[in-house]
């Protein structure tokens, strides 16, 4: 069965940059990209030209009414996401939506409530769930290798947020449209992994935000402290101050984390009996008996794999790999951090 997919809000950079959803959809077997939409038709036409010239629409309503897709990929500005999600739910269309699904937890909660009531298929792409770090962490947790957990440390520092205007997403630097900076965007991944691996809820115990390097209205750096009810601690660092901007289309070098190409990233989970760390595509495991160091890079593009998994789960009648509730849990922590750190956010 060929899945007929329409994409909304394709001026979002993930349409053809970074995760590059449209590029992956265009080369997937049994998938047809039947149309793209954006309120900026010139940008939509540029995006369409990169992926085989599917029909371009300025109106989401017109595209959905005309094409009647099987599945929708919903991108767009953060301040429009909740409205788009509710429209798709009203139409009973299955879809994936880019995080954070709204400006704040209040907006995302309305989506989650409706998804629960309808039983709709709504997925949130989180490729870090399939990373080497998470795979090894889950294996070691299942084996009881860590003993009681102590803490997780997650750092994601990507290159300058000046990339957003260059990619037709200048709204990302406006807190009223984006809901925040590096924490609202990049922090989702680390918070989701912290919650997923601990299997617990968490609260924010400390937060600070920096604007000093890039001098934009949204933060270019954030650090957040977390703690679960059982006492597992977490430290999250996110930023847009990596000094080198990678060239789109260039294959990452052997020493770089392909999930965060061109980034300064580190992922660590520590217990009484073991430590697991991922950095620059390498895995380090330390126990009382010794130490292992080895490379573990993905064999296929993580975003492609994530998209394929989402579509396969829908086709097989299974729940999405990551759903709205998962997104909401992370967004709530982001909101807590902004309040605690007295940062400018919606």
What function would you assign to each model-found segment?
Residues 12-17, 128-215:
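Predominantly a Rossmann-like dinucleotide-binding segment in NAD(P)-dependent oxidoreductases
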Residues 16, 277-278, 297-308:
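Active-site loop of classical SDR/Rossmann-like NAD(P)-dependent oxidoreductases
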Residues 110-128, 148-151:
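Rossmann-fold dehydrogenase core element
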């Amino acid at each position: 069965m060929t899945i007929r997919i329409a994409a909304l809000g394709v001026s979002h950079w993930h349409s053809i940059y970074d995760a590059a959803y449209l590029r992956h959809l265009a080369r997937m077997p049994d998938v047809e990209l039947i149309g793209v939409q954006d309120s900026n038709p010139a940008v939509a036409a540029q995006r369409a030209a990169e992926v085989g010239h599917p029909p371009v629409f300025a109106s989401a309503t017109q595209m959905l009414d005309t094409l009647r897709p099987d599945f929708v990929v919903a991108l767009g500005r953060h301040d429009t996401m909740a409205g788009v999600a509710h429209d798709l739910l009203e139409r009973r269309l299955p879809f994936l939506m880019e995080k954070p699904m709204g400006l704040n937890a209040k907006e995302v909660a309305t989506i989650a409530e409706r998804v629960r009531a309808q039983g709709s298929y709504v997925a949130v792409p989180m490729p870090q769930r399939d990373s080497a770090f998470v795979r090894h962490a889950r294996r070691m947790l299942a084996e009881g290798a860590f003993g009681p957990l102590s803490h997780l440390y997650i750092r994601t520092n990507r290159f300058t947020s000046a990339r957003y205007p260059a990619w037709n997403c200048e709204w990302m630097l406006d807190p009223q449209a984006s809901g925040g900076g590096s924490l609202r965007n990049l922090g989702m991944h680390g918070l989701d992994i912290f919650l997923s691996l601990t299997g617990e809820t968490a609260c924010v115990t400390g937060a600070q935000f920096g604007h000093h390097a890039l001098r934009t209205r949204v933060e270019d750096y954030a650090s957040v402290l977390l703690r679960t009810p059982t006492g597992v601690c977490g430290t999250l660092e996110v930023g847009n101050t990596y000094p080198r901007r990678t060239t789109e289309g260039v294959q990452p070098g052997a020493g770089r984390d392909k999930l965060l190409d061109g980034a300064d990233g580190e992922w660590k989970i520590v217990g009484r009996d073991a430590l697991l760390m991922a950095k620059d595509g390498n895995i380090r495991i330390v126990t009382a008996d010794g130490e292992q160091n080895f490379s573990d890079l993905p064999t296929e593009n993580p975003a492609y794999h994530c998209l394929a998994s989402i579509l396969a789960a829908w086709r097989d009648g299974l729940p999405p790999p990551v759903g709205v509730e998962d997104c909401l849990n992370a967004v709530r922590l982001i909101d807590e951090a902004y309040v605690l750190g007295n940062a400018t956010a919606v």
